[in-house]
């Protein structure tokens, strides 16, 4: 059903991308069951529906939030608070040298325990270390390549311009709520089964590939 909705609102270059993106959306609801989670990268020139890809993820992925740039503190606080998908549009800005720190957090946080931010809070003269985690599903849209380490964690969805007319995925459409209800129901009824089969997935694959494709 998710694949059908994707085909109604976005035109991918390869037909298999519909299944990949649909599976990624479903997996976001189970990401706490996994040790690592792959990122999605919509890569292409202007007017290739990259941002639309993120908008659809924003409608369907778990507790998704879409941004066009953020500070380290805002990024980590958002992920730690929502425990959902973090979507970055115009992600070529991450290639700026001033964003080296936040790129490091993005690159590290594809695994559980990675990308943690610690701050010292002083209350009534007592020091307390607070820890915020940034492990979560993440997706990007950009015209240029991402940082090499960050790109290495991504499933790349190459986008091209198309003449095919597809309707805009407006946020008020009832289908988004219906699909999210189905996805939450799937999580509540199947999370134990997912935890059970996850350790045996990806056998025979190399380390990084196995990490990224096991979910």
Predicted regions and their residues:
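Conserved catalytic network of the ASCE P-loop NTPase/AAA+ motor domain
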Residues: 32-35, 76-81, 99, 112, ...
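Conserved alpha-helical scaffold flanking the Walker A/P-loop in AAA+ ATPase domains
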Residues: 68-85, 92-100, 104, 124-129
């Amino acid at each position: 059903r998710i694949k059908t909705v994707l085909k109604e609102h976005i035109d991918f270059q390869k037909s298999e991308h519909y299944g990949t993106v649909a599976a990624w959306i479903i997996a976001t609801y189970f990401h706490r069951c996994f040790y690592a989670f792959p990122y999605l990268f919509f890569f292409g020139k202007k007017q290739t529906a990259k941002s639309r890809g993120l908008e659809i993820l924003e409608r369907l992925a778990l507790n998704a939030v879409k941004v066009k740039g953020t500070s380290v503190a805002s990024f980590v606080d958002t992920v730690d608070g929502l425990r959902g998908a973090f979507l970055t549009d115009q992600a070529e800005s991450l290639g700026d040298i001033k964003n080296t720190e936040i790129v490091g957090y993005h690159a590290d946080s594809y695994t559980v325990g990675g990308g943690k931010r610690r701050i010292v809070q002083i209350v009534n003269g007592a020091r307390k270390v607070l820890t915020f985690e940034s492990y979560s599903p993440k997706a990007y849209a950009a015209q240029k390549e991402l940082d090499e380490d960050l790109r290495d964690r991504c499933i790349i969805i190459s986008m091209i311009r198309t003449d095919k007319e597809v309707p805009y995925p407006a946020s008020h459409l009832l289908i988004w709520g219906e699909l999210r209800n189905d996805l939450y129901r799937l999580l509540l009824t199947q999370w134990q089964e997912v935890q059970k089969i996850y350790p045996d997935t990806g056998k025979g694959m190399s380390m990084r590939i196995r990490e990224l494709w096991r979910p």
